[in-house]
């Protein structure tokens, strides 16, 4: 996966920098680019489309097909990015480009995505407390993605891109079992 990230990063950075530059005149430019790249990434991630890219020897055909499928979803600059990526035989990394682009947007907006897995559904107060604690620790706004996993027994697991906090009973029991061995 790190190879894909390495390949995708320059495309994502260029698209992000261009979107930020455009946002001086169009406040929704970053959101538009997020939508364009998200749609193109979904198309490129389709199994039939990936097979087509793998078996197409013409760069022009691959680019034209992708632009045609995406249609009105891409503006002229989005189409230029698709054509450049096709020319470099990188259309298959569009999903990774989208992921990297989203990371740049999160950094730019000073937000972080935090996954919270709990044994029981969290109420609004608990979510607010976790969000406040994570905002303080990360020094940025957080977006919580909460889910329930009954196998935790009790407690929560909090995950970000940088670290994991395992405050679950299952995690504590596993650590205790490892210490006793």
From Swiss-Prot:
Topology within the bilayer: Peripheral membrane protein
One MF term in the entry's GO annotations: proton-transporting ATP synthase activity, rotational mechanism
One GO CC annotation: plasma membrane
Keywords: ATP synthesis, Cell inner membrane, Cell membrane, CF(1), Hydrogen ion transport, Ion transport, Membrane, Transport
InterPro entries per UniProt: ATP_synth_OSCP/delta_N_sf, ATPase_OSCP/dsu
Superkingdom of origin organism: Bacteria
Short name of any one Pfam family annotated for the protein: OSCP
Localization per record: Cell inner membrane
Function description: F(1)F(0) ATP synthase produces ATP from ADP in the presence of a proton or sodium gradient. F-type ATPases consist of two structural domains, F(1) containing the extramembraneous catalytic core and F(0) containing the membrane proton channel, linked together by a central stalk and a peripheral stalk. During catalysis, ATP synthesis in the catalytic domain of F(1) is coupled via a rotary mechanism of the central stalk subunits to proton translocation.
Record's subunit section: F-type ATPases have 2 components, F(1) - the catalytic core - and F(0) - the membrane proton channel. F(1) has five subunits: alpha(3), beta(3), gamma(1), delta(1), epsilon(1). F(0) has three main subunits: a(1), b(2) and c(10-14). The alpha and beta chains form an alternating ring which encloses part of the gamma chain. F(1) is attached to F(0) by a central stalk formed by the gamma and epsilon chains, while a peripheral stalk is formed by the delta and b chains.
Family annotation (PANTHER family): ATP SYNTHASE DELTA CHAIN
Family: Belongs to the ATPase delta chain family.
UniProt name for this protein: ATP synthase subunit delta
